Amino acid sequence: MNSFDKTSDFIDQVIHRLYEKNRHDRIFSKDAAHSSTTSSVLFLLGMHCQETDFSNLPCLILNKRSLKVKQPGDLCCPGGSISSRVDAFLSKLLYLPGSPLTRWPYWQLWHKQRRTEARDLALLFATCLREGFEEMCLNPLGLKFLGPLPQQQLIMFQKVIYPMVCWINRQKRFSPNWEVEKVVYIPFQDLLNPSLYARYRLNIKTSKDNENHPDIRDYPCFIQHSKHSTEILWGATFRITMVFLEIVFGFTPPDIKSLPVLSGSLDENYLTGNG
């Protein structure tokens, strides 16, 4: 992170690396805009590490899911499924001058040379902007769009996630709704530290049938320590984060077989949100 002493250098590096990654690849599947399995999320970056001592370094900003939703306690990016009518209307507003999308340096190129994908990009970006506002009162006009990340497939749910990388310019306070327990800030300085990764060994108790035959699975994870709590980043959000770190910094986490074991469990409430 020492090579990014200036915020502008960090942002420019992210924009450039994402564009180079995406310039020759198709980002969205052909039915992405119409599939019920499609979700889009905001991969939020900013300088607001309020719970750490690294307030002047770039951070990843995530939501911690509340006990009232599926996957309670997990760290996630704000976002969700497409609301056809609402998001179609909002996507048209993103074509207006001064929007986060039209301020993106490569928008005009996409709009001219990749028109279908540009339309899908606008729709999916509108979706996660709306969800970000609903979940944490994120100001969509205060974001700088840096580019899309490759899609991710959820393992336990039939969902395809399209992450949109954004920089939060000025907003420092958020107001989470009932879906969100709190906002979590992870400095990239920590994410680039191999010693903070572990092997998350989960005992998955999704029914009484497997009590005598436990379903034990290992997942790579990142452990975030703060003054008030310890958070575990794993699953789809972990994979999205690792893709970002590899594209932008050339960083890959240690092999899972070499990592210390951290034990945990999931019960049937994990899939229903009835905790």
Q: Which role fits each region the language model picked out?
A:
Residues 183:
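Amphipathic alpha-helical interface segments
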Residues 1-180, 188-275:
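N-terminal leader/linker segments that precede catalytic domains of diphosphate-processing enzymes
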